[in-house]
């Protein structure tokens, strides 16, 4: 049997066809636009996602027996607010995870409602990208649209709705809304009341591997699939990527270098970071996880290469960064191009190059970008370690993980071995794995991961470089608090 995995990303949907034994039979990608109607805003039209899926799946199945497809599972960009009216029509464009317009609402939630109360209700505090502040923004700024809301969902849930006609979500994705009681796996009445929405407007909750329904006749006809194909609830992209990299069960870590960057630490028991600098979410395997998220990771390198250096030859730009330059770069980079989430929770934060001199080179700045992202990931790792969480090794996924140089820099800055899974399709592969569990191909997510996940290579840290980078990190770590007062002034002048 075949299983379709959907990776609903920020810039494109990636679709993969997985055999029951885990082999990837085909991969297709379809891009769609992203709109920035105002500085700091970020939106997409949900219809563009669905159109991309409808165009991509027939292409994915070309040359394969569609009758052998048993299930579909999606991993999707988290936190985006999708709102439907009583006729299930989209009311307004989706406000995405990297949208920073909700600073006022975040301040209200954290300072008026209070971080302690938020943590009690949801195990988390408010961040600009979360869904609840977006609902408050709609209520404050677009009251006519807010009153039309009949259903609230997340990006991948809209795809599942179009596939099955069911309004649903899973616990891992719902955890990032600031509307879910993460510990008890139910909607928080307190948060729904604060946001002015009833539970009837919220999607039904499922475990990620549970089937939410089967394809409707209309969806099956559009996709060229039989109506009996099961659709599982799927997961938020980070949880799906963790499944696709084998980070399931207790005490595993997965680091993702995608558009954003994440540190994902699994646990069989519920726990909250004392400072709420890390997210405490449900995992797609039925357990829990702590997660740190930096808003700009591989997107920093893409911005630097394509927008500033006007090149797409990433490998050539990295060639001058030789071994002796590692741990010896005097140029530092703060990767806050979209503000920052973990650990600073500061939508006003800005990206910066610091330490430039007349003899600084293009390669120094390229190296600084790679190192700055790794230092920001280390910020999250160190917070987890301070809570007593042991992180002895990690898997690594995402577009940035394809760079051997970046893997080497990351391993030495973090001081741990980094394992690269055989498949590079983390969220999509995880989605297909969850679909395989939903269809009974595997009994549990753990069994599926144990049988399917293979490691391609491991990057080991060099003790001498670990020591050099530790000193550089201590200096880098002081830069944000030094510049923080200026970010608010920059915001005021905008």
Feature-to-residue mapping (PLM):
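N-terminal glycine/serine-rich phosphate-binding loop of ATP-dependent small-molecule kinases
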Residues: 1-92, 120, 148, 220-221, ...
């Amino acid at each position: 049997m075949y299983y379709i995995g959907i990776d609903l990303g920020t810039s494109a949907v990636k679709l993969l066809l997985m055999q029951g034994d885990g082999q990837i039979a085909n991969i297709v990608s379809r891009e769609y636009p992203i709109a920035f109607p105002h500085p700091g805003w970020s939106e997409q039209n949900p219809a563009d996602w669905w159109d991309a899926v409808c165009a991509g799946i027939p292409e994915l199945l070309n040359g394969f027996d569609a009758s052998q497809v048993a299930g579909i599972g999606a991993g999707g960009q988290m936190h985006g607010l999708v709102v439907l009216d009583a006729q299930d029509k989209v009311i307004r464009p989706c406000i995405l995870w990297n949208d920073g317009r909700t600073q006022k609402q975040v301040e209200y939630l954290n300072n008026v409602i209070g971080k302690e109360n938020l943590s009690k209700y949801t195990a988390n505090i408010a961040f600009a990208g979360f869904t609840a502040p977006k609902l408050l923004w709609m209520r404050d700024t677009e009251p006519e649209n807010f009153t039309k809301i009949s259903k609230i969902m997340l990006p991948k849930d809209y795809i599942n709705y179009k596939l099955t006609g069911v309004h649903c979500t899973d616990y891992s994705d719902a955890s990032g809304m600031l509307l879910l009681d993460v510990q008890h796996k139910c909607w928080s009445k307190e948060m729904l009341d604060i946001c002015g929405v009833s539970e009837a407007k919220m999607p039904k909750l499922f475990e990620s591997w549970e089937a939410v329904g089967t394809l409707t006749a209309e969806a099956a006809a559009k996709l060229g699939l039989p109506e009996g194909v099961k659709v599982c609830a799927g997961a938020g992209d980070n949880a799906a990527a963790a499944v696709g990299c084998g980070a399931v069960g207790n005490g595993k870590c997965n680091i993702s270098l995608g558009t954003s960057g994440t540190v994902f630490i699994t646990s069989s028991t519920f726990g909250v970071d004392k400072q709420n600098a890390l997210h405490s979410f449900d995992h797609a395997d039925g357990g829990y996880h702590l997660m740190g998220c930096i808003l700009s990771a591989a997107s920093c390198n893409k911005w630097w290469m394509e927008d500033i250096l006007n090149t797409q030859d990433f490998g050539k730009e990295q060639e001058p960064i030789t071994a002796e330059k590692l741990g010896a770069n005097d140029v530092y980079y703060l990767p806050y191009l979209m503000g920052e989430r973990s650990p600073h929770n500061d939508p006003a934060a800005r990206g910066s190059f610091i330490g430039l001199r007349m003899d600084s080179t293009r390669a120094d700045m390229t190296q600084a970008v790679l190192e700055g992202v790794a230092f920001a990931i280390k910020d999250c790792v160190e917070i987890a370690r301070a809570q007593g969480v042991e992180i002895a090794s990690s898997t690594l996924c995402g577009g940035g993980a394809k760079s051997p140089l970046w893997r080497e820099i990351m391993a030495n800055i973090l001081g741990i071995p980094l394992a690269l899974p055989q498949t590079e399709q983390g969220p999509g592969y995880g989605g297909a794995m969850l679909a395989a569990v939903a269809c009974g191909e595997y009994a549990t997510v753990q069994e599926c991961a144990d049988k399917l996940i293979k490691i391609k290579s491991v990057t080991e840290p060099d003790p001498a470089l670990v020591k050099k980078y530790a000193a550089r990190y201590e200096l880098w770590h002081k830069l944000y608090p030094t510049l923080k007062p200026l970010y608010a002034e920059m915001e005021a002048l905008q």
